[in-house]
């Protein structure tokens, strides 16, 4: 997220106290409302009071946007000042109109549903009012670019029939009544899927992050990272990478990460020898990668899950390896920069531990935690068989026991000061002395991960329980520490906990103002696509420009994401590009004989939307880092993007090799993939940095690029030496179809690639060829599989002639390329079946790894030779 993450609205601090308190109070109400929505209390209270205290999904969206628009128009003043009194009046007036337009839908929901599609004058009035208000809110809080994009889509809906539109873009256009109803009065527009995800999921995760930050966890992670890594060469830079990664677990904002961790890490990086631009760039690269880190991954992660119909658990699994590899690679890049600059680390006052000691401690800790987790999971599974209530009480009891134990340990040490003190910089504290002060901060994160990954609860319910756990920590940590330190119990620790909780709730809601507005206006874009089919002609245009090349199309989509990301928030950018391009990429992939999972395409768009945060000339994260480092923001952005090139290649690789996403692979294959992907990233980083142990020779850089590519795409080389498919043509297809008992040998994905040839829809005299991927049921005869796929075939001489697929079948959309009613028929020319007797693609890992080792040894010899020469000179 970009401007979605702004914690304090522009000009917020210039308000008079009473106005600021009013906004803070509304923010508090919003957070409490969202917690109310996620809890079971409305159901219990409704049963007791006989009142309807439960809000359905549509009602929740309406109230959610009412809060977001109202706060957005109050907290973000007009950019061009006219008169203070008039400006204030306009803010209150616009906020009241926006809230009224949302609440109108809630109050008159039954009347509106009864006249579906037939709006009254008052319906149209409130629809237009709501659209104008959300447009003003977008302009004030998110800037002009997103407003322009949304306005263009609305203009196309209203005036798509005009002559200045190309023939391929024209559509019949919508009347004012139809457009207003579509965008405001139903769930196809503003109150659509995007706003629904914001209401049910995004808010709770943002709130959890705000509460965790307020509890002191952010400061704890920064100090722990410095205590662990600060003594290494270039320690502050390496600590920045780890701290941003830890912050990314609960924060989905690159700018928030830069502002939070960069305030401490950037000055220290400069102090150890990094230039202002490089210090800022390292923080930017670390923070943008924080948005890729599961489980939060920014607001777009939940939208990806919703749009692709992939469970949130699976999405986390798919995103885990790319995020891990990206962070390891960034850590390695920082290490290479440190070597080239000859930097040292910070001093520490504890003796160094041997590698064997560290490794033994790690294995022991990992085994102990794994064993405890296994025992707890087994215990919960066993008790859940006869009483889910008992399991719930047992879980709470375990949480309380662990929490009290962690607080007791933390109470033995003084509380951590905010930021790094001069004493800590001059003499780094031991890891243990810092770690024990904040074990209790890890418990809410464990609750979140346990609920999502082990218990498989919904994202919203997982975030709800995690939020409750951190609320409990906020309220009790100070009183309990005072109790364990044998201090006299006063009201002050309780008061401080309550104030921290209130501020955390307010901070979470403030962070959501722009997210709610962005997801609301994004509904206009999605609504336009659903109403007009705009994605079809845009997809056809991009497909024409790319000449049907999947690689070129991916490059164009990447540039589109980067360019739009310069002006749009990550969430809106992702929605725009994925809505228009995701189906086209999947289709073009099929035509090129490649099965591209929809979730991989959405992650591709998501990655490049995030990378726009440090892409000059606009990258907002780069500007935030430059403000702290006092460096040049453009140079910071360029340097940051050069570090992020390693992240930019990952989406291209996992489109062609979905193993990188751990997509449908076993444990052993997954383990091998993790090792090779990390090694590939290290090789690529050595190539782009032109350094491994010493400076690369030209041939070494070239070899490292080839090694990286081979580890990412071993199938590329295999396809060059062995045909990937068996081809079945003409009479062979006829024989297969005629034999009802024939079971075709399919590949492990139960898919085949089919080539069609027929008259072009736009020019029937021209024959065109198209490839499609069809998923078959492996256990059925060929003829049954073909019918289920929507292939209606007839035999004409030696040709297999295809009739037009029925609407709703898998091939209906893809086959629009052909004219089925021309003089020449559409024929099924070839079926391609993956060969099962090919060499394993993993065989190409062996030479790649061997060459990598040889390069390493060669550079090691060169370094030793250089060191001996230097010693002889001395």
Regions found by a protein language model. Name each.
Residues 1-114, 124-128, 329, 708-712:
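Conserved, well-structured core domains of diverse proteins
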Residues 2-18, 27, 317-510, 623-712, ...:
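Long, contiguous bundles of hydrophobic transmembrane helices that form the permeation core
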Residues 23-28, 60-75, 90-99, 125-133, ...:
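Hydrophobic mid-bilayer segments of alpha-helices in multi-pass membrane transport proteins
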Residues 48, 369-388, 591-594, 716-851:
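Low-complexity, proline/glycine-enriched hydrophobic segments characteristic of transmembrane helices
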Residues 121-125, 188-201, 228-240, 272-278, ...:
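Membrane-interfacial loop-to-helix junctions in multi-pass transporters
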Residues 136, 140-141, 151-153, 160-166, ...:
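Core transmembrane alpha-helical segments of multi-pass membrane transporters/permeases
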Residues 208-211, 246-247, 288-293, 518, ...:
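Hydrophobic transmembrane alpha-helices
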Residues 222-290, 296-303, 309, 570-609, ...:
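Hydrophobic transmembrane alpha-helices that form the pore/transport pathway of multi-pass ion
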């Amino acid at each position: 997220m970009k401007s979605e993450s702004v914690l304090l609205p522009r000009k917020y601090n210039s308000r008079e106290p009473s106005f600021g308190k009013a906004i803070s109070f509304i923010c508090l109400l919003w957070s409490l409302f969202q917690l109310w929505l996620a809890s079971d209390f409305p159901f219990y209270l409704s049963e007791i009071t006989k009142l309807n205290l439960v809000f359905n999904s549509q009602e929740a969206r309406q109230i959610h946007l009412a809060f977001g628009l109202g706060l957005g128009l109050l907290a973000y003043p007009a950019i061009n000042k006219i008169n203070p009194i008039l400006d204030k009046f306009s803010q209150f007036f616009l906020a009241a109109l926006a809230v009224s337009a949302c609440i109108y839908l809630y109050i008159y929901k039954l009347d509106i549903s009864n006249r579906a599609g037939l709006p009254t004058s008052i319906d149209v009035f409130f629809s237009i009012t709501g659209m104008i208000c959300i447009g003003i809110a977008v302009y004030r809080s998110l800037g002009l670019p997103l407003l322009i994009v949304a306005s263009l889509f609305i203009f196309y809906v209203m005036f798509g029939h005009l002559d200045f539109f190309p023939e391929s873009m024209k559509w019949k256009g919508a009347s004012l009544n139809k457009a207003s109803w579509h965008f405001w009065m139903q769930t196809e527009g503003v109150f659509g899927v995007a706003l629904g995800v914001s209401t049910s999921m995004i808010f709770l995760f943002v709130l959890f992050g705000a509460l965790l930050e307020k509890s002191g966890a952010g400061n704890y992670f920064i100090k722990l990272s410095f205590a662990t890594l600060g003594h290494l060469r270039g320690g502050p830079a390496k600590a920045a990478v780890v701290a941003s990664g830890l912050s990314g677990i609960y924060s989905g904002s690159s700018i928030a990460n830069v502002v939070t961790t960069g305030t401490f890490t950037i000055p220290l990086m400069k102090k150890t020898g990094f230039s202002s631009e490089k210090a800022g760039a390292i923080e930017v690269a670390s923070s943008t990668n924080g948005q890729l880190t599961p489980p939060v991954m920014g607001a777009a992660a939940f939208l990806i899950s919703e749009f692709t119909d992939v469970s949130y658990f699976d999405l986390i699994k798919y995103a885990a390896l790319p995020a891990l590899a990206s962070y390891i690679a960034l850590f390695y890049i920082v290490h290479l920069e440190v070597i080239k600059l000859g930097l040292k680390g910070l001093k520490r006052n504890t003796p160094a531990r041997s590698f064997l000691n560290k490794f033994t401690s790690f294995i022991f800790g990992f085994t102990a935690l794994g064993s405890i987790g296994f025992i707890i999971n087994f215990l919960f599974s066993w008790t859940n068989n006869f009483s889910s209530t008992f399991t719930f009480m047992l879980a709470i009891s375990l949480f309380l026991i662990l929490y009290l134990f962690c607080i007791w340990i933390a109470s033995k040490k003084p509380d951590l000061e905010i930021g790094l003190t001069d004493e800590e910089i001059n003499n780094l504290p031991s890891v243990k002395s810092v770690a024990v002060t904040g074990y209790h901060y890890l418990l809410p994160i464990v609750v979140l991960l346990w609920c999502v990954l082990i218990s498989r609860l919904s994202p919203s319910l997982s975030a709800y329980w995690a939020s409750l756990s951190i609320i409990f920590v906020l309220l009790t940590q100070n009183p309990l520490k005072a109790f364990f330190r044998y201090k006299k119990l006063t009201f002050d620790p309780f008061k401080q906990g309550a104030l921290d909780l209130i501020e955390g709730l307010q901070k979470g809601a403030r962070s959501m103002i722009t997210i709610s507005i962005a997801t609301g206006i994004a509904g206009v874009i999605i609504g336009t696509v659903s109403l007009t089919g705009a994605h079809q002609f845009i997809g056809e245009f991009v497909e024409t420009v790319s000449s049907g090349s999947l690689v070129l199309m991916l490059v164009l989509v990447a540039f589109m994401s980067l360019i739009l990301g310069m002006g749009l928030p990550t969430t809106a950018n992702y929605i725009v590009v994925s809505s228009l391009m995701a189906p086209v990429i999947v289709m073009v992939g099929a035509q090129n004989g490649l099965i591209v999972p929809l979730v991989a395409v959405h992650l591709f768009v998501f990655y490049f939307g995030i990378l726009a945060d440090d892409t000059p000339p606009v990258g907002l994260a780069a500007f935030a880092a430059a403000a702290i480092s006092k460096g040049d923001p453009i140079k910071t952005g360029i340097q940051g993007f050069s570090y992020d090139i390693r992240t930019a290649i990952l989406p291209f690789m996992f489109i062609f090799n979905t193993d990188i996403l751990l997509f449908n692979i076993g444990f052993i294959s997954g383990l091998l993939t993790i090792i090779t992907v990390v090694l590939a990233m290290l090789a690529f980083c050595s190539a782009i940095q032109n350094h491994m142990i010493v400076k690369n020779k030209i041939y070494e850089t070239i070899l490292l690029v080839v090694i990286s590519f081979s580890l990412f795409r071993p199938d590329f080389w295999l396809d060059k030496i062995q045909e990937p498919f068996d081809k079945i043509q003409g009479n062979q297809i006829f024989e297969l179809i005629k034999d009802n008992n024939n079971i075709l040998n399919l590949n492990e994905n139960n898919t085949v690639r089919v080539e069609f040839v027929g008259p072009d829809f736009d020019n029937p005299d021209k024959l065109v060829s198209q490839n499609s991927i069809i998923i078959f049921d492996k256990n059925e005869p060929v003829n049954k599989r073909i019918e289920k796929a929507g292939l209606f075939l007839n035999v004409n001489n030696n040709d297999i002639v295809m009739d037009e697929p029925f609407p709703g079948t898998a091939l209906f959309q893809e086959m629009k390329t052909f004219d089925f009613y021309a003089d020449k028929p559409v024929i099924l020319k070839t079926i391609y079946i993956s060969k099962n007797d090919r060499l394993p693609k993993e065989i190409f890992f062996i030479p790649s790894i061997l060459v990598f080792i040889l390069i390493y040894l060669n550079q090691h010899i060169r370094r030793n030779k250089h060191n001996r020469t230097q010693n002889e000179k001395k």
